[in-house]
Amino acid sequence: MSASDFSSAVVVLAAGAGTRMKSDLQKTLHSIGGRSLISHSLHAAAGLNPEHIVAVIGHGRDQVGPAVAQVAEELDREVLIAIQEEQNGTGHAVQCAMDQLEGFEGTIIVTNGDVPLLTDHTLSALLDAHVEVPTAVTVLTMRLDDPTGYGRIVRNEEGEVTAIVEQKDASAEVQAIDEVNSGVFAFDAAILRSALAELKSDNAQGELYLTDVLGIARGEGHPVRAHTAADARELAGVNDRVQLAEAGAELNRRTVIAAMRGGATIVDPATTWIDVEVSIGRDVIIHPGTQLKGETVIGDRVEVGPDTTLTNMTIGDGASVIRTHGFDSTIGENATVGPFTYIRPGTTLGPEGKLGGFVETKKATIGRGSKVPHLTYVGDATIGEESNIGASSVFVNYDGENKHHTTIGSHVRTGSDTMFIAPVTVGDGAYSGAGTVIKDDVPPGALAVSGGRQRNIEGWVQKKRPGTAAAQAAEAAQNVHNQEG
């Protein structure tokens, strides 16, 4: 029988202060790979499809509670909350959780909110090992080349766990053991409930230790076994910023490898960062210095980078995005973006469209084949199909109090340095001359021009700026002109 044939519940411990993070943000809310630490733990728990998930929170619960609720919404399932008013040890934390599991009979897995690399696959293997042979407690263990600081797993000849011995209490013989406690357990619910009632705080810390449940269970004749994780790196806890960075790097390494095995070419994995929710198609090329964040979706045959950051972006098949920062927007199939393009939320670039160098967009819809080649701001605007916006154009959308919309039709050609003073509409097929300030609607097919003939005021610089370098240069040039004349 497998774990899926048995009822299970998962308890996630996340009540600690995490003082070593030296942060106003509660420890489990720090993020790697686009998710908070506790979000990673809750996703792993949900992967078991347990009957119940309980998050035990305490320190910083005003921050952690809403975060847990948000993850529950993402998972589309209930996550129960247990409050540990005083952080009185791991045993006390699980006692608090049991109030939410009244009447539950089955297997309870206890894990932590600061082990972001732990997968549902490993938790499922622990659950399978626990139910395969009836056991009171199954400890998830790991083997380390350097086990210093960890509680050693002592087994008898039958392979049962007889003790978890902390480093400070271990003899030389025990210190030589490389199998250590991960802090993740599977318990028989009834035995756990009974043993928790017997916990005592007669130890150096004056706390209730969850590990004492193992001794109580063995004292009552119940078997305690261990299951060794296939990859010890999954069980690395995060207690400070160094460990946060290390866990983030390892998670990213795994994510990048998965993308490459899925058909993407990543030129330099060391400088490419991909969040866990990102989706990447086949035959994608990702150049160095690229960050793909949030729920970004990359289609097939897309080229991204170098030096590009995309957050919650959707990139259509065959598109190219170079040296661009983009947020919460959509790029159509076979479109080209960059270099040095800033795409702000609410932008949609149609298929075969173009956003060129030093272009900024916000709340802009740009139709199929339309181009904004360079040095332009497009905000609060709609541009039809196959239109071209000249260089250095500005969509002037703010009057000091309110934002206004500009509508550009299809097959429009605007000259360089055109200003669109919103609200304004430019009809299909219209043109504008260079330097035009468009304040009124332009009919379809019309040419818009503004400003009178150029007037040159001779001698203005020498009169108004006498003695300046400009005046001296002008006078010298005029003298040469007069001599040649």
Curated annotation (Swiss-Prot):
> Which residues act catalytically here?
374 (proton acceptor)
Region Disordered: start-end pairs: 465-485
Name the EC number(s).
Answer: 2.7.7.23, 2.3.1.157
Q: What class of enzyme is it?
A: transferase
Give the pathway listed in the UniProt entry for this protein: Nucleotide-sugar biosynthesis; UDP-N-acetyl-alpha-D-glucosamine biosynthesis; N-acetyl-alpha-D-glucosamine 1-phosphate from alpha-D-glucosamine 6-phosphate (route II): step 2/2; Nucleotide-sugar biosynthesis; UDP-N-acetyl-alpha-D-glucosamine biosynthesis; UDP-N-acetyl-alpha-D-glucosamine from N-acetyl-alpha-D-glucosamine 1-phosphate: step 1/1; Bacterial outer membrane biogenesis; LPS lipid A biosynthesis
* Cofactor note (record): Binds 1 Mg(2+) ion per subunit.
Give the residue ranges for region: Linker: 242-262
The UniProt annotation places Mg(2+) binding at: 114, 239
Alphabetized HAMAP family for the sequence: GlmU
Q: Where is this region: N-acetyltransferase?
A: 263-485
Its gene name is glmU
Q: Which organism is it from?
A: Corynebacterium glutamicum (strain ATCC 13032 / DSM 20300 / JCM 1318 / BCRC 11384 / CCUG 27702 / LMG 3730 / NBRC 12168 / NCIMB 10025 / NRRL B-2784 / 534)
Q: What does this protein do?
A: Catalyzes the last two sequential reactions in the de novo biosynthetic pathway for UDP-N-acetylglucosamine (UDP-GlcNAc). The C-terminal domain catalyzes the transfer of acetyl group from acetyl coenzyme A to glucosamine-1-phosphate (GlcN-1-P) to produce N-acetylglucosamine-1-phosphate (GlcNAc-1-P), which is converted into UDP-GlcNAc by the transfer of uridine 5-monophosphate (from uridine 5-triphosphate), a reaction catalyzed by the N-terminal domain.
* Annotated SUPFAM superfamilies: Nucleotide-diphospho-sugar transferases, Trimeric LpxA-like enzymes
Q: Which GO terms describe its cellular component?
A: cytoplasm; membrane
NCBIfam families per UniProt: glmU (TIGR01173), PRK14352.1 (NF010932)
Q: Name one GO biological process term.
A: cell wall organization
Catalysed transformations (reactions): alpha-D-glucosamine 1-phosphate + acetyl-CoA = N-acetyl-alpha-D-glucosamine 1-phosphate + CoA + H(+); N-acetyl-alpha-D-glucosamine 1-phosphate + UTP + H(+) = UDP-N-acetyl-alpha-D-glucosamine + diphosphate
UniProt xrefs under Pfam families: Hexapep, NTP_transferase
Give the UniProt family note. Answer: In the N-terminal section; belongs to the N-acetylglucosamine-1-phosphate uridyltransferase family. In the C-terminal section; belongs to the transferase hexapeptide repeat family.
At which positions is acetyl-CoA bound?
391, 397-398, 416, 434
Descriptive protein name: Bifunctional protein GlmU
For this protein, the record's InterPro entries field holds: Bifunctional_GlmU, GlmU-like, GlmU_C_LbH, Hexapep, NTP_transferase_dom, Nucleotide-diphossugar_trans, Trimer_LpxA-like_sf
